[in-house]
Regions:
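Short intrinsically disordered terminal tails
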Residues: 1, 80, 84-89
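Short alpha-helical segments that sit at the start of domains
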Residues: 1-15
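Short, cationic-aromatic polyanion-contact patches
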Residues: 5, 53-82
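Surface-exposed alpha-helical segments enriched in charged/polar residues
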Residues: 14-17, 42
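Short capping segments at the starts of secondary-structure elements
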Residues: 17-25
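A short acidic, leucine-rich amphipathic alpha-helix
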Residues: 25-31
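Short amphipathic alpha-helical interaction segments
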Residues: 32-46, 54-57, 63
Length: 89
């Protein structure tokens, strides 16, 4: 991965460690274009390092969006919730 994009991926990851946000909110906060954030989201999800915490209306766009996190404690809780939902649908 090119250094510039790797640096952006790290910034994205670190921002979502401390904030639960949509990609539009992240773009506004740290200035990385949403098209790149979408790519980083897919990469981190595949690695198990990012989860959708909830669906809601974005504070920036007002449209339905996923609220995201890379916080390990939040990831653990979301994964536990998903597991319970598979046991008791």
């Amino acid at each position: 991965m090119e250094n510039h994009f790797k640096s952006q991926l790290i910034q994205y990851y670190e921002y979502l460690q401390k904030n639960t946000a949509t990609n539009s909110m992240v773009e506004q906060a740290i200035g990385i274009k949403q098209i790149n954030l979408t790519r980083y989201k897919a990469t981190l999800e595949e690695e198990g390092n990012l989860v959708v915490v909830r669906k809601g209306f974005c504070e920036v766009t007002g449209f339905p969006a996923d609220y995201l996190s890379t916080n390990k404690e939040i990831i653990k809780k979301v994964n536990e919730r998903k597991y319970k939902e598979t046991l008791f649908p």
